[in-house]
């Protein structure tokens, strides 16, 4: 089964058009998008306009495009999770769309017997939207927070509620706790996890200065459960700084394709990978990086 994976498109229309072109060129059967699908900031740069702008993007562009992908290509299923900027994500599923599947904290068994499991949350960032942020674990350090930060009041309203991020995040379950409650697959060696945050301390989570910004709990989860493959995003620039878009944690292959990084200033080329699910390493290709070894 041919898979196309990307992440962090942030409402960039030209990247979505490239996604459609790549789906056609690669004859992909499944598309997976690992979060941050929607525009981060509205043209007004006002947080109160963020959700209405994202909903407009969904209605006028994204939903029609995804339907077009399913109609005009060999793609039969599109799996999505939100990222930390996707406060308007529930609007994508206001109506059922055949072939477009919300994988957030859910599992899905494909016709070939492989299982997909999605997880959207990331450790605290310096940014203000907090719907999809949680403490990594009770001891993990945080970056300085901006006060006020914002959460969406509910899925039924566009209103954002200002919050003090420190008590808000301390009052939520941690990523570590969440991961223990994810659906349990039948066989880890035939399971692919789509997680917006990359694992900490790998070649997939490097930011400027060589610091790691991924999730310690996600790395521990991968070490302990050893799934076939994990797919990530969030840290756009990591492949640029580490020189690699894949890493190995035990026997698990982990991938962060990156996206239009500030280091290269290349915003015109979609960062994505394609592969055959039954022989991932032999067929893995990146749109911007040469084929590399994972060991």
Model-identified regions with their sequence ranges:
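Extreme N-terminal starter segment of soluble prokaryotic enzymes
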Residues: 1-4
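Active-site environment of divalent metal-dependent phosphoester hydrolases
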Residues: 10-14, 38-42, 80-92, 108-110, ...
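Active-site-proximal loop/helix segment associated with metal-binding centers of metalloenzymes
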Residues: 114-208
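Binuclear metal-dependent phosphoesterase catalytic core
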Residues: 107-112, 216-224, 238-295
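A short helix->loop->beta-strand "cap" motif at the edges of active sites that frequently abuts
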Residues: 70-78, 226-228, 249-252
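Active-site-proximal segments of metal-dependent phosphoesterases and phosphodiesterases across multiple
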Residues: 38, 45-59, 186-226
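Proline-aspartate-enriched helix->loop->beta-strand connector
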Residues: 28-32, 218-232
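Core catalytic region of metal-dependent phosphoesterases/phosphodiesterases
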Residues: 13-111, 257
């Amino acid at each position: 089964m041919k898979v196309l994976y990307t992440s962090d498109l942030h409402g960039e229309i030209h990247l979505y058009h490239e996604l459609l072109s790549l789906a056609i060129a690669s004859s992909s059967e499944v598309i997976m998008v690992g979060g941050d699908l929607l525009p981060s900031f509205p043209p007004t740069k006002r947080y109160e306009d963020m959700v209405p702008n994202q909903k407009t993007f969904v209605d006028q562009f994204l939903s029609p495009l995804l339907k077009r992908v399913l109609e005009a290509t060999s793609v039969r299923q599109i799996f999505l999770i939100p990222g930390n900027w996707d406060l308007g994500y529930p609007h994508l599923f206001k109506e059922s769309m055949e072939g477009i599947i919300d994988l957030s904290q859910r599992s899905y068994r494909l016709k070939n017997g492989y299982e997909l499991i999605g997880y959207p949350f990331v450790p605290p960032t310096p940014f203000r939207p907090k719907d999809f942020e949680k403490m990594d674990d009770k001891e993990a350090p945080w970056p300085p927070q901006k006060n006020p930060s914002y959460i969406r009041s509910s899925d039924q309203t566009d209103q954002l509620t200002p919050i003090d991020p420190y008590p808000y995040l301390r009052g939520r379950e941690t990523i570590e706790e969440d991961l223990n409650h994810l659906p349990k697959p039948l066989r880890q060696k035939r399971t692919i996890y789509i997680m917006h945050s990359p694992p900490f301390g790998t070649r997939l989570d490097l930011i400027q200065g060589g610091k790691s910004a991924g999730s310690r709990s996600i790395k521990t989860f991968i070490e302990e459960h050893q799934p076939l493959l994990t797919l990530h995003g969030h840290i756009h620039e990591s492949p640029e700084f580490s020189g690699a878009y894949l890493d190995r944690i035990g026997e698990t292959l982990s991938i962060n394709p990156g996206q239009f990084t500030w280091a290269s200033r290349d915003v015109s080329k979609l960062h994505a990978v394609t592969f055959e699910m039954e022989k991932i390493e032999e067929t893995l290709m990146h749109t911007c990086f040469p084929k590399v070894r994972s060991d």
